[in-house]
Amino acid sequence: MKLDARFESKNGKLYALKTGEKADTGAFIPFDSGVLSGVSSESAEAEAQRFSQDRGKILAVYVSHRAAEISENTYDEMYLAALRVFLKGIETYGAYAVAVPLSDGDDAERLTQAMCHTARRIKDCASVIGFALPDSLTESEAAAFIDAMSEKHSHYVYFSNRHTGTALVTYAVAGLR
C-alpha cells in the first residue's frame, strides 16, 4: 500500500501539505518503542492510548536497531508488528510520529537495512511522517540511508540536527533538549 505524503520539507522546516501550515518540530514527545518488545497487540494499543489527547502533535518514536534486528538479517517480527499496532493506534488519535533510529554503534549498512525492513512493516501507517537520521552516520552514509529508504517510501520526510541539507528538518524532543 502506497501512502501519499502528508508533510513536506522546505528550507529545513516541516509543513502540512493539506493546509500549508508549518508544523511544530521544537518539542516532539518522546516514546521508547523498546517497551513494545514481546508485547501483545492489546498492550501495544494500550501504549497508543496514552497519546489519545495529543491530536496534531508529533512523537519521536525511538527504534533501537537491536530491537528491530535480533541478529544479522533476522528481524523481530513480533516487535515490528507491535510497533505497527502502536503507530496505527496513534493514527486514530490524530497524532504523528517520526521514527528515530538508535544505532547502538552498529554498522551503518546493517542499520540502514534494518530501518528499511522496519519501514516495510509500518508502510501503511499514515501517522509516520518519516525518519530521523542517526547522528552516528557520516554524510555519505546519511545520503545512502535516504536513498535506500526513498526507493519504496518516497513520501517520507527526513530529520536531522547534525547532517546538512535544506531537505532535512531540524527537530527537538521535549525534555531532552
Predicted segment positions?
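Active-site-adjacent "subsite" loops/lids of carbohydrate-active enzymes
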Residues: 104-120
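General structural signal for secondary-structure boundaries
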Residues: 40-44, 107, 162
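Active-site region of glycoside hydrolase catalytic domains
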Residues: 92-95, 116-177
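Short glycine/proline-centered loop/turn elements that form peptide/ligand docking sites
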Residues: 101-107, 135-138
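Amphipathic alpha-helical segments in well-structured domains
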Residues: 83, 111-115, 142
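N-terminal carbohydrate-binding accessory modules
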Residues: 1-60, 147-151, 169-177
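Arginine residue identity/basic-tract feature
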Residues: 6, 50, 55, 66, ...
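Aromatic-lined substrate-binding rim segments of carbohydrate-active enzymes
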Residues: 41-103, 143-157
